Swiss-Prot record:
Record Pfam families: Ribosomal_L28
Protein name: Large ribosomal subunit protein bL28
A single Gene Ontology CC term: cytosolic large ribosomal subunit
Region Disordered, annotated ranges: 1-23
SUPFAM superfamilies in the record: L28p-like
Species classification: Bacteria, Pseudomonadati, Pseudomonadota, Gammaproteobacteria, Enterobacterales
Source organism per UniProt: Wigglesworthia glossinidia brevipalpis
Keyword rRNA-binding part of the UniProt annotation: no
Gene Ontology biological process terms in this record: translation
Gene3D superfamilies, per the entry: Ribosomal protein L28/L24 (2.30.170.40)
InterPro entries, per database record: Ribosomal_bL28, Ribosomal_bL28/bL31-like_sf, Ribosomal_bL28_bact-type, Ribosomal_bL28_sf
Top-level taxon: Bacteria
Similarity comment text for this entry: Belongs to the bacterial ribosomal protein bL28 family.
Record key words, sorted: Ribonucleoprotein, Ribosomal protein
GO terms assigned for molecular function: structural constituent of ribosome
Length: 78
């Protein structure tokens, strides 16, 4: 569970590593995850999230407030 983005839900993918002679060897493709701290004005506190670069771009585009509201709605339905 530690290699999952908390915003987008991206997980490691499996595939093949190919050598020059096209021999296949199993490998994993990991998302570009980073630990990042965000300030929430509404709650007056910091939160720590483990997010992918795509998740960070979503936060830059829409703002942490909208993204957090969408996440809470997503987790309430499950």
């Amino acid at each position: 569970m530690s290699r999952i983005c908390q915003i987008t839900g991206k997980k490691p993918l499996s595939g093949n590593k190919r050598s020059h002679s096209m021999n296949a060897k199993k490998r994993k493709f990991f998302p570009n995850l980073h630990n990042h701290r965000f300030w929430l004005d509404k709650e007056k506190k910091f939160i720590n999230l483990r997010i992918s670069k795509q998740g960070l771009r979503l936060i830059d585009k829409y703002g942490i407030k909208k993204v957090m509201e969408k996440i809470k709605i997503k987790y309430k339905n499950v």
